Curated annotation (Swiss-Prot):
Repeat is among the record's keywords: no
One GO biological process term: gluconeogenesis
Name of the protein in its database record: Phosphoglycerate kinase
A Pfam family reported for this protein in Swiss-Prot or TrEMBL: PGK
Keyword Transferase attributed: yes
InterPro entries from the UniProt entry: Phosphoglycerate_kinase, Phosphoglycerate_kinase_CS, Phosphoglycerate_kinase_N, Phosphoglycerate_kinase_sf
Metabolic or biological pathway, per its Swiss-Prot or TrEMBL entry: Carbohydrate degradation; glycolysis; pyruvate from D-glyceraldehyde 3-phosphate: step 2/5
Catalysis: reaction(s): (2R)-3-phosphoglycerate + ATP = (2R)-3-phospho-glyceroyl phosphate + ADP
Subcellular location, principal: cytoplasm
Record GO cellular component, one term: cytosol
EC number: 2.7.2.3
Amino acid sequence: MTKTFRTLDDVDVKGKRVLLRVDLNVPMDAGKVTDTTRLERVMPTITELSGKGAKVILLAHFGRPKGRDDKNSLKPVAAALADVIKKPVGFADDCIGEPAAKAIAAMADGDILCLENTRFHPEEEKNDPAFVAKLAELGDIWVNDAFSAAHRAHATTEGLGHKLPAYAGRTMQAELVALNKALEAPVKPVIAIVGGAKVSTKIDLLENLVTKVQALVIGGGMANTFLHAQGVKVGKSLCEKDLAPTALRILDKAEAANCAIILPVDATVAYHFEANAPSFAYGLDAIPDDAMILDVGPRSIERIHAAIDDAATLVWNGPVGAFELTPFDKGTVEAAKHAAKRTKAGKLVSVAGGGDTVAALNHAGVADDFTYISTAGGAFLEWMEGKPLPGVEVLQVK
């Protein structure tokens, strides 16, 4: 990802038909958009292109339709987008063919048009060359501003980059710059915090991180698997016992790479998985057989703080406890607040991503204090795993 990629600074868009791939996959309830975060994220690129006199043609998917399906139409999303950007947004009820061509032909410079859900055509996800060619006829250049879909080699996220001059939008550019700063060319030492329920979903991520960071904090349910692998009795806690050999392999790999692994040294446990259940802090040698670990304990929180203090860069994915239940949010909230404080003091570059992580940082009230928050989900994880992202690769200057 340290390779260079073309941005909007490299192209004159006046009078050009710009096919702009955006992420409009917003939550809906009864035909109304309930969270406009993703619409706000695409606003800078749309308004810049429109202001420079481009004909801005939006391409996006919505949901997982099997063919045309009105409840996955982008029409209400286009209306919500118009409210957010405070500009009219036209709508065409297909993304190819006559409806799209006619609507585009009627555009004036600076106009914005949203084409219908690209996934109404199964060829979108197959990256079908004939479908890509039909889309390419509608534009002069392609701008990808959907990092969240960059791990998919679909027609509108990757295929168009082989047919039209390709550029990164401002949201994509910001994401690539932030991620590059965090793992590819970071200020060292780098610490990663990885939490969440299961090791099984994050094996590739852990194996990549131990070769890139100087310290790795493992928390959440997945820490129990590592503790079990080391002979700790974890009671009724969530634990993937069959992955003990995998956990030991990751620990060995970390040691060989000189990456310090920071596991819990104590735990906050309860007998019931529910909010405000009576909870107790125990050392790892005393976890009751009928209790479950739901958060890191007070000494573990101190260790996480110390690790953050020693770091210049932090990459975070996944909560370190059952943060959705009080009081088992304490470890995650305190670590988040500590990282935010260091960031605000100019002592830490902090990058976080993944759905649960963003929710946890919002819950802690510190999301705005991190250097960068990625809303990308799957693409953020694949980047952390060190995998090439097709929608980014195609933007790079060869």
